[in-house]
Structure formats: structure tokens, C-alpha cells
UniProtKB/Swiss-Prot annotation:
Subcellular location: Membrane
EC category: hydrolase
Protein name per UniProt: Epoxide hydrolase 4
Residue ranges that the Swiss-Prot or TrEMBL entry lists as coiled coil: none
Species of origin: Homo sapiens
Protein's gene: EPHX4
Keywords of the record: Hydrolase, Membrane, Signal-anchor, Transmembrane, Transmembrane helix
Organism phylogeny: Eukaryota, Metazoa, Chordata, Craniata, Vertebrata
SUPFAM superfamilies: alpha/beta-Hydrolases
Length: 362
């Protein structure tokens, strides 16, 4: 009887794990079926158009705009990977490290590179697997532990022990984890449109609306098919994400120009360029929830109210995981791509946060 009591907790844990993974893969199958129907519909309308992809051999001129900074590379010790980044501002100034989301790369921070270089060494990174940064082949190389170690090693390689850390979307997830695991490395934390990781995992299990909005997390668990679907019709999905009325950048004057959009398509149309970014998501269900989750770094959370991928209620709940100073600002009529959609307002809010004194909660 005593042995049975000892085994019962392990048995319950095993059953919960089996149930969880059964639900994950069932939803993966459902998402894959929906995308397969989309593919068949596209083929029915015109197979030639579905598989059309013009060659893009040369990067658009905007990617070499000198006003954005200097293209640099650093090889880090732990993994041996070479990382690409664009840096603006003088060496020796305090470091501001910018982590992009999906499907983005360093260029999504173009407004911030210009804005903050007067007082900071601003570094906009291509994350592991993105852009000109090395992309390991195996999905195991994209676990959250690896991504966290990347940022720690990059700081060391750049000669800094701490930074102002800003992350958007998936980069926001990594920024939260850095602040949790290495609080001494983060002077101030700024996250754009991504809640605390524990809030995200708890909320998605209880709210079907967020489960639907995050369906791509599940679709990305499937090998090769997501990359294929992302690239058909000359990257129609990518264009839709940034330009459509439902998901795109809506503010007039900040919408992506033809050249901006071509820059995104150029980067993700390179051979194998989609597998690295999607591999980030292929490990997420084995890494969450977190064992340690409290944030002690002064934190600013910025949120676009019209985010098509994240429920705004998650932003409000995030404050329970921040022990120290926490400020939340929700911008009305702003999309998920907040730092590109409302750059003037976002930059002003960041400046205010950086310059104000942040005291611990009583």
C-alpha cells in the first residue's frame, strides 16, 4: 500500500504528460489539415502562381543604409556560432541590446537604431538561425537554454557585463528569460507585445481565443510543411502579416514601403532561411512552464491593443511576476508590430522609462 502511495504521484504526472502531448499533437494535426486545404485551394486557383518565386540575388538598398549603423559579426565561445548584428552609437556607451521577433530580423529595429544611438551603443541582433547569423541544422539547437546562453555570451563578446534589454514578440520571450536567469545582466527590461512566459502558458490553456491566435505555434511543430506553406505564392503569408488590415501595420506613414517589404522577403527567401526561425518554436512545449519565474529588474511592458496574435488581458496579468518596478502602457489602435507601427510614441515611452528613477515596490 505504501509503495502504491509512492508511485501514485509519478503515475499522475505521467498521465498528465501523456494528456498534454496528446492534445498538442491533435491540435498540430488539425492545424496541418487546415493548411493543407489552403494549399489545395491555392493549387486549384493556379499551380503556376502557387510555386512562383522570383530570384532575389541582391539585398535591397535599405539594408545597407549607413544611417542605421554598421554591420558587424561576432563568434561566441559556447556554441562557436557567428552572430550578425547592426550597431549604432559610440563604443563604450551603455549597451542597448535589441531582440527581434518572428518573422523579423534586425531591420525591425530601424527606428530605434536611429533614435537611441546618441546615448547608447545600440545593437540590433539577428537571433540564432535568422538572417546572416549562423543557423544550426538540428532543432535541438534552438532550445530556450541555447537562446539564453547566446545572449549571455554575446554580452561577454561585446565587452559588456550588463545592458538595457529590449525584446519584441519572440525576442520578448527571450528577454523575459534573460531577466529571470541573469538579472545582474539587465539594467532595465523593456518588452513589446509579449507577456511573461508563465502568463502565456497558463492563459493559452484556459482561453480558446488565445489558443486560436497561437495556432501557428502548433502548426510549426510539423517538419518542413510550415516552411513550404510560408514560401508559396511568393511569400504571400509574410506579406499578409505585415500589410493586411487584420494583422499588419496600420498607421499611415509607418506602413512598410515596397523596399521594406522586399527586405523581409529577401532575407527569408534565402536557402534554408525559414527553418532556423521556425525551429525556435519547435522546442517551446518541452521548455515551459518555467521553474523560476520572478523578475526583479525594473520593467516596462508596451502593448499594441489591436494585436492580432496576443490577447491584451495577458499584459495586465504579467505584473504579478515582476517584484520590482513595473509599468504597463497599452497603445490604442496599434498592432502587434508596435515598434514599427508607432515608433515615435514607443521611442518616447522608452526614453521616459530609461531616464526615470525606478524604485522597488514596498
Amino acid at each position: 500500500m505504501a509503495r502504491l502511495r509512492d508511485c501514485l504521484p509519478r503515475l499522475m504526472l505521467t498521465l498528465r504528460s501523456l494528456l498534454f502531448w496528446s492534445l498538442v499533437y491533435c491540435y498540430c494535426g488539425l492545424c496541418a489539415s487546415i493548411h493543407l486545404l489552403k494549399l489545395l485551394w491555392s493549387l486549384g486557383k493556379g499551380p503556376a502562381q502557387t510555386f512562383r518565386r522570383p530570384a532575389r540575388e541582391h539585398p535591397p538598398a535599405c539594408l545597407s543604409d549607413p544611417s542605421l549603423g554598421t554591420h558587424c559579426y561576432v563568434r561566441i565561445k559556447d556554441s562557436g556560432l557567428r552572430f550578425h548584428y547592426v550597431a549604432a552609437g559610440e563604443r563604450g556607451k551603455p549597451l542597448m541590446l535589441l531582440l527581434h521577433g518572428f518573422p523579423e530580423f534586425w531591420y525591425s529595429w530601424r527606428y530605434q537604431l536611429r533614435e537611441f544611438k546618441s546615448e547608447y551603443r545600440v545593437v540590433a541582433l539577428d537571433l540564432r538561425g535568422y538572417g546572416e547569423t549562423d543557423a544550426p541544422i538540428h532543432r535541438q539547437n534552438y532550445k530556450l537554454d541555447c537562446l539564453i546562453t547566446d545572449i549571455k555570451d554575446i554580452l561577454d563578446s561585446l565587452g559588456y557585463s550588463k545592458c538595457v534589454l529590449i525584446g519584441h514578440d519572440w525576442g520578448g520571450m527571450i528577454a523575459w528569460l534573460i531577466a529571470i536567469c541573469y538579472p545582474e545582466m539587465v539594467m532595465k527590461l523593456i518588452v513589446i507585445n509579449f507577456p511573461h512566459p508563465n502568463v502565456f502558458t497558463e492563459y493559452i490553456l484556459r482561453h480558446p481565443a488565445q489558443l486560436l491566435k497561437s495556432s501557428y505555434y502548433y502548426f510549426f511543430q510539423i517538419p518542413w510543411f510550415p516552411e513550404f506553406m510560408f514560401s508559396i505564392n511568393d511569400f504571400k503569408v509574410l506579406k499578409h502579416l505585415f500589410t493586411s488590415h487584420s494583422t499588419g501595420i496600420g498607421r499611415k506613414g509607418c506602413q512598410l514601403t515596397t523596399e521594406d517589404l522586399e527586405a523581409y522577403i529577401y532575407v527569408f527567401s534565402q536557402p534554408g532561411a525559414l527553418s532556423g526561425p521556425i525551429n525556435h518554436y519547435r522546442n517551446i512545449f518541452s521548455c515551459l512552464p518555467l521553474k523560476h519565474h520572478m523578475v526583479t529588474t525594473p520593467t516596462l511592458l508596451l502593448w499594441g491593443e489591436n494585436d492580432a496574435f496576443m490577447e491584451v488581458e495577458m499584459a495586465e496579468v504579467t505584473k504579478i511576476y515582476v517584484k520590482n518596478y513595473f509599468r504597463l502602457t497599452i497603445l490604442s489602435e496599434a498592432s502587434h508590430w508596435l515598434q514599427q507601427d508607432q515608433p515615435d510614441i514607443v521611442n518616447k515611452l522608452i526614453w521616459t522609462f530609461l531616464k526615470e528613477e525606478t524604485r522597488k515596490k514596498d
